[in-house]
Regions:
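Residues immediately within or flanking Cys/His clusters that coordinate Zn2+
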Residues: 1, 18, 31, 38, ...
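Short, hydrophobic/aliphatic alpha-helical segments
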Residues: 19-26, 65-76, 108-126
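Short functional micro-motifs and their immediate structural scaffolds
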Residues: 8-12, 29, 39, 49
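Conserved phosphate/anionic-ligand binding catalytic regions in large, soluble enzymes, centered on
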Residues: 85, 125-144
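Polybasic, low-complexity association/targeting segments
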Residues: 59-91, 177
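A structural-propensity feature for long, helix-poor, extended segments
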Residues: 145-146, 150-196
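Short cysteine-rich clusters marking metal-coordination/redox-active sites
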Residues: 3-6, 21-24, 34, 41-44
């Protein structure tokens, strides 16, 4: 990711530095700095990274949503700072879905809305509220692409809840402790199947084994179907 001021690369430092954010000018303590020593506050970093998410999604030609998610996971800045499936899962689904359409969506607008809603999902919602962020992100994705709102009549309104509910049920049956990647795999697979059934759009999917085991010290190991 490039500094908007000087175009040099932004990196993550091991230590925090005090200074003024080069974007908004407020005093901040940050571990994000560019090659010319410009600092970035948390709020501006998140805005820049959301733009990075959109850039990766725009450039992706994949019709497999998990492949898009891996592209996001593997970006240095996103991985170390902004790994929130609440936002990334829906963005990856929208990208793969759009790549399957002959008449494309306004992907930037769709991603903006998915990320806006995804940011409202509280952290640790899986254990504190029975709502996995990845599962809810799938519901957000489906709601946005079908333009469903609280007063939408008929089955369309219910489809969003049915999808989210099926993701949660399938994930819950595996048991804890939580794993964000497992939540993404279960929920995205359910969503791929549901979109084909309800909307007639066939995204790509292949069975996978997890190669992010090292990210989760509480990995279930052989108790996880993706181990």
């Amino acid at each position: 990711m490039k500094c908007p001021k000087c175009e040099s690369s932004i990196r993550k430092e091991d230590q925090m530095t005090n200074g003024k954010c080069i974007v908004c000018g407020k005093d901040c303590e940050s571990d994000r700095i560019c090659g010319n020593l410009h600092l970035f506050c948390d709020d501006c970093t998140e805005r820049l990274i959301r733009e990075r998410v959109k850039e990766i999604c725009r450039d992706s030609a994949s019709k497999d949503p998990y492949s898009v998610l891996e592209e996001l996971y593997e970006d240095d800045i996103i991985r170390t700072r902004f790994l929130k499936n609440h936002i990334l899962v829906g963005s990856a689904l929208a990208t793969a879905y759009n790549n399957c359409l002959s008449e494309k969506m306004d992907l930037d607008s769709v991603l903006d809305e998915i990320m806006r809603r995804g940011a409202l999902i509280p952290p640790k919602a899986c254990g504190h509220a029975g709502n996995c962020g990845s599962s809810v992100a799938c519901g957000i994705f489906y709601s946005v692409i079908t333009d469903t709102h609280p007063l939408t009549p008929g089955e369309q309104w219910g489809d969003v809840s049915v999808l989210t509910g099926s993701c949660l049920v399938d994930l819950g049956r595996i048991g804890g402790p939580r794993c964000c990647n497992r939540g993404a795999l279960v929920s995205m697979k359910d969503t791929v199947d549901y979109v084909e059934e309800r909307l007639g759009v066939k995204m790509e999917w292949k069975d996978r084994k997890c190669h992010y085991k090292g990210w989760n010290k509480n990995c279930k190991g052989e108790g996880c179907p993706f181990y």
